[in-house]
Design a protein with these regions (language model features):
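N-terminal leader segment of winged-helix/HTH proteins
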Residues: 1-7, 11-84
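C-terminal ligand-sensing/allosteric alpha-helical core of TetR-family HTH transcriptional regulators
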Residues: 58, 62-77, 153, 164, ...
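Short, hydrophobic-biased segments on the C-terminal half of alpha helices
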Residues: 107, 125-126
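Charged, amphipathic alpha-helical coiled-coil/dimerization segments
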Residues: 126-185
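Exposed, interaction-prone assembly regions rather than primary DNA-binding/catalytic cores
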Residues: 181-212
Length: 212
């Protein structure tokens, strides 16, 4: 499914294609990966105007930058994963299953770990199952539950996709490793305040390990 931005008539603004991505609560519309090549930074320009009209613009500029960064990264990651027949959401599910002890997890737990709505989990697993990367089987610990289990083909695809993402540093090649750790820590505070998790002995508190 491809939607188009309004416009595109002769003399009007050019249309821009959008790529779908499986995300919680539905499908985000993600702009295709194409440099805008603007002669100025639109977020910085908006911040200047904001300062004149409303006051401190730092929160607005930070949020707007995060939202734009998400668009850029999702487009970049999906472009890297497209040759493997995956979106980033489906890749996350495959990796989660690979991380599990037996390569299988209850659907409910997949939703919790990926922090997505149950409907999104169903859609993701449906796609992976149709590709032969995941199978479903009854959960022996819960007569009404279902397990999603990664297949041998799913493990192979996940391994190849991971190699490509690692080579591209997940689209974050413009940052040093220490800067990535700092970014994780800063955004972790936002997630903590939103109630994503309860800090404790099992939760990392210093950010991801960094190879030097």
């Amino acid at each position: 499914m491809v939607s188009r931005q309004a416009g595109g008539a002769r003399g009007g603004p050019r249309r821009r294609a959008w790529l779908p991505a499986d995300r919680p609560g539905g499908r985000y519309l993600v702009p295709v990966r194409k440099p805008l090549d603007l002669p100025f930074d639109p977020i910085a320009r908006a911040a200047q105007i904001w300062e004149r009209r409303f006051g401190d613009s730092r929160a607005m500029a930070a949020v707007t930058s995060i939202m734009r960064a998400q668009q850029i990264l999702i487009a970049e990651l999906d472009a890297l994963l497209r040759p493997h027949g995956l979106t980033f959401a489906r890749y996350e599910a495959l990796v989660l299953l690979r991380f599990s002890r037996e390569g299988a997890l209850p659907m409910r737990l997949i939703g919790q770990r990926l922090m997505v709505h149950p409907t999104s989990v169903t859609n993701i697993i449906n796609r992976l199952e149709a590709q032969g990367l995941v199978v479903r089987r009854p959960n022996p610990a819960d007569g009404r539950g279902t397990l999603a289990e990664i297949t041998a083909a799913g493990r192979e695809v996940a391994a190849r996709a991971t190699a490509d993402l690692m080579a591209a540093r997940f689209g974050m090649g413009g940052y040093r490793t220490d800067e990535l750790g700092q970014l994780f820590t800063l955004l972790r505070g936002l997630r903590l305040a939103a109630g994503d998790f309860t800090p404790g002995p099992a939760a990392a508190t210093t950010g991801p390990a960094v190879s030097r």
